[in-house]
Amino acid sequence: MSRYRGPRLKKIRRLGALPGLTRKTPKSGSNQKKKFNSGKKEQYRIRLQEKQKLRFHYGLTERQLLRYVHIAGKAKRSTGQVLLQLLEMRLDNILFRLGMASTIPGARQLVNHRHILVNGRIVDIPSFRCKPRDIITTKDNQRSKRLVQNSIASSDPANLPKHLTVDTLQYKGLVKKILDRKWVGLKVNELLVVEY
């Protein structure tokens, strides 16, 4: 699948903070001019921006996001909440939220290069859907542990969501349960994404 490889700070300036995309922050004086339109164009622009926030934060293509919206639409609960739960339970996002990778693209690279085990098996698919009671560890070699060690050392344990636990000494994470809406690490209105 293709990924966004272009300038990341441009996306952050346009869409706001996207912690999964990059750790960089734009300079404070780089605010762009706000263009005010009225009517349908304004509503369309707001919905499009919310959708783009989700896409760029989680590193999804348009087709992947549509597939997740379709799956969430079949659920009996709120479509927006189910969509966020599906996206938050992806393996690359879980690694990012555990602090084992500094960004979601970095987590994708760890998974693609076969450094990550889920329940004792190598998983090389970043979109792998984790379930409650899944144990996520690194491969038992120095190179894999060193890659994760740097990220864990620089991460803040206070930002760890309640649905995850991490053992920093053994480089092991546990998914305790499916997350609540309040622990999503992105300010987004998921209902506007579903309406788009």
From Swiss-Prot:
GO biological process: ribosomal small subunit biogenesis; translation
PROSITE patterns in alphabetical order: RIBOSOMAL_S4, S4
Keyword line: Chloroplast, Plastid, Ribonucleoprotein, Ribosomal protein, RNA-binding, rRNA-binding
InterPro entries according to UniProt: Ribosomal_uS4 (IPR022801), Ribosomal_uS4_bac-type (IPR005709), Ribosomal_uS4_CS (IPR018079), Ribosomal_uS4_N (IPR001912), S4_RNA-bd (IPR002942), S4_RNA-bd_sf (IPR036986)
Region named Disordered: 15-42
Location, primary (coarse class): plastid
Pfam families, per the entry: Ribosomal_S4 (PF00163), S4 (PF01479)
An MF annotation (GO) of this entry: structural constituent of ribosome
A GO cellular-component term linked to this record: small ribosomal subunit
Domain of life of the organism encoding this protein: Eukaryota
Domain S4 RNA-binding per the UniProt entry, residue ranges: 89-150
Family: Belongs to the universal ribosomal protein uS4 family.
Function: One of the primary rRNA binding proteins, it binds directly to 16S rRNA where it nucleates assembly of the body of the 30S subunit. With S5 and S12 plays an important role in translational accuracy.
Assembly with partners or alone: Part of the 30S ribosomal subunit. Contacts protein S5. The interaction surface between S4 and S5 is involved in control of translational fidelity.
Protein name, as recorded: Small ribosomal subunit protein uS4c
